[in-house]
Every structure is written in C-alpha cells, then in structure tokens.
Regions:
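Short Pro/Gly-enriched beta-strand edge/turn motifs at strand-loop
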Residues: 45-58, 131-136, 282-286
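Non-catalytic accessory segments flanking enzyme active sites
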Residues: 18, 25, 29-68
C-alpha cells in the first residue's frame, strides 16, 4: 500500500522542514493500526529491525516463536549452533507451526497434517501426500516447500531481520557507529562484552507507540524533571547531542562509574583514562537503544506490540570474564537496579505522550531548535523512509 492512500505526502514533507518550522509526525502514525502496519512494512521492514537476542536460545536445536507486529516468526538455533529466522507457518496450509519456545528433539511437526521440517527449515516429511500410505509423490517436490527464511544477522547478541531483503548489509549500516566508538572501546571492546547467564536483563511493558520510546531516549532535555537522581551528577549541561546516519542520541561527560562497597567493575582496557566519566546513549534506527560506559554497555530492543503498546527488552554487557565473577555480583546488580529506576522514570512521560496523541488539540507538535535536534532527526529519518517507499510504490 502506498502511503498516499493513508496520509497526504505534504504532511510528511513538512516534517523535513528546518527544525524551527517543522512539525512532527502526525497522530495517526502513533494511534492507528494501518499506520502501525505501514511502520512494520516500510520503516522497520526496509531496514534492520531487532527481534530478539541470540543467547535467549540457550542450546542447539532450540526454537523461539515470536510475533513481529502481527507476523508470526521463528528464531531457530540449528543442531550446529547457527541462528536463523523463518516465517513460523507451515508451507502446506499456513498453520502456525511452533507455539512455545523450547528444544526440538526430532523434527518440527505441523499440528494440522503432520508435515515435518528439520532445523534448517527443509521439508522432510509429508504423510500421505500422494494418497494413503504414499508419503512421497513425484508431482510434489519437497525441496521447493521448506520454511520461508528471512534475511537475518547478529550483532552484540541482537538478532536482526530485514523483511524487504534489500537493505545494505547490517555491518555496513552499523559501521559509522562502530567507527565512532573505537575512541572509547578500541578495536577489541566489542569482543570483550560478556552477558550474565542469569540476570542482567529486564523487560518493561509501556503503553506507548514504539517511536515515542525512541524519541524520549534520543534527548536529554527532560533530564532535570524526569530523572532527578540522575540529574544530581549528570546534569543537563553535561550532555551533548549525537546525530549521524541511522543514529541519534546524547552523550554525557559526567557518568558516575559503578561503585558498590568500594568495588569498581572492570573497565574497557582501551577506554581513555581522561574520559572515564564519558558515556554515550544512541538509538540505532529503527528499534534499538544502545548505551556505552567505561565499565559496561547495554542494548535495548523495542518490541512494537500494538499502536499504543511496546515492550522494552534490556540486556547488560560487562567487560571480560572477570566481570562475571562472584566478586562483582553486587556491582552488577547495582548497575541493573540503577537502570531499572531510570527506565521506570520514563514510563509516565512516554505514556503521557501517547495519550496526547489522541487529542485533536495536538497533531505533531513543535521542536526546540536546540534541545530537540536528535528527536527531529529521528522524525525526519522516519518520514524519509515513508516518502521513499511511496516513490517506489
């Protein structure tokens, strides 16, 4: 569906105006189901969207079904350990195949006609396909009817998909960020990140559109009023805007290193000694929120559930194997709790914005010419995705 059928193109073009003249995306993009599906197909679908975490598939032969904005998908770790993503539907009559996450002992079996698939998606069994007790038929080629794969890739434990299949490679999209962060992480920092087997994760359900979570994360403008404890040491004036390519966010000169009972977490060995209190918080469009500090990093996947509902999935990463030892357990828990407080403080704001999107007295709003630069940048990026898709329609 071309977007001209849903909304005047002029409305999106107005988002692209200079910030002092621009207005934001209109309310329908936050409240209406057809626009939610448009986001799925044209904004998230034409880019690399995160749908889960590889370590949530703890063993080989493990499958995890998930719903991606109405599409039933299946994240699958095969018997050799490779993670792949497929449409979670039988190629025969379209029945949803897998209902619950877990280990597959033999084959994936369709509950309708008992067709079976291996853990690489190949169709292996077709009972009575050629008639009673005729389980093969020369008129039916099993190799043409396996599960339908999606283009997928993994970075920083996150599983990404590209629905359209034609986005540039994930590493190409990420290159501007990874190059930027070499100044902090060095060339080995990503390889040093470690996740706890248990712990170091949380999920928060918020009653807002996924885009509002991105917008809130991108800017520090709300800090003094929404995050009073954080503002005691990392004040508004200690922050700077970050805007480039598929990224927008904020940096801080005053992150407070984790210190619990005198225990400091291990830090990235390449992190500059004179910048230990620097931190950067960047959204990788469309639905990933990232943070790096000298002693840990985090990734948050935004799971769009409905026009007015999103689940935020956070994962923490610490530096090296030593950081996961019992000696640092209290420090790791303290980091988790501090982020739990910060993200909980944001809930009222993003849910308040969602409620406001139902008002005829608001339809996109205005931007601060200085403080809202990252937010406006995200609006422009989203508007361009939609305008580009309309041109291709």
């Amino acid at each position: 569906m071309g977007i001209a059928n849903l909304i005047p193109v002029q409305s999106l073009e107005a988002v692209l105006a200079p910030i002092e003249q621009a207005h934001g995306l209109t309310n329908d993009f936050y409240t209406k189901q057809p626009f939610f599906e448009l986001d799925r197909d044209q904004v998230l679908g034409r880019n690399w969207a995160c749908i889960g975490f590889a370590t949530d598939l703890p063993t080989n032969a493990y499958v995890k079904p998930m719903d991606f904005m109405g599409l039933p998908l299946l994240i699958m770790r095969n018997r050799e350990g490779q993670v792949q993503v497929f449409h979670n539907v039988c190629s025969h009559r379209g029945v949803k195949l897998v209902q619950e996450a877990g280990t597959i002992q033999g084959m994936i079996r369709c509950p309708y006609h008992s067709w079976t698939y291996d853990l690489n998606g190949a169709l292996r069994g077709t009972p009575h396909v050629g008639g009673i007790n005729q389980h093969k038929d020369e008129r039916f080629a099993c190799e043409k009817h396996g599960l339908k794969p999606l283009r997928s890739a993994i970075w920083m434990d996150m599983v990404f998909i590209n629905l359209s299949g034609d986005a540039p490679p994930l590493e190409e999209a990420l290159a501007p960020l990874t190059e930027r962060w070499v100044q902090f992480l060095g060339h080995d920092g990503m390889d040093l990140m470690r996740r706890e087997t248990d712990g170091g994760k949380m999920s928060i359900e918020v009653n807002c559109n996924w885009k509002l979570a991105v917008e809130n994360y991108c800017e520090a403008y709300h800090l003094p009023w929404v995050h009073p404890s954080l503002n005691t040491y990392s004040k508004l004036e200690d922050h700077y805007n970050i805007i480039f390519d598929q990224f927008a966010g904020q940096g801080s000169y005053a992150y407070n290193l984790s210190d619990v009972a005198g225990t400091h977490l291990p830090t990235f060995p390449s992190w500059p000694a004179d910048r230990m209190r620097n931190a950067e918080y960047v959204s990788f469009f469309p639905n990933v929120l990232l943070g790096i500090q000298a002693d840990h990093a985090f990734a948050m996947m935004l799971e769009p559930v409905a026009p007015g509902k999103t689940i935020e999935h956070l994962r923490l990463f610490f530096v090296g194997d030593e950081a996961l030892s019992p000696h640092y357990e209290a420090a790791r828990k303290a980091v988790m709790e501090s982020w739990r407080v910060v993200f909980a403080e944001d809930i009222a704001s993003v849910e308040g914005m969602q409620k406001g999107r139902s008002s005829p007295g608001y339809n996109g709003g205005a931007f601060s010419p200085e403080m809202d630069l990252p937010t406006h940048y995200f609006h422009k990026w989203a508007a361009r995705q939609l305008l580009n898709s309309n041109e291709k329609a």
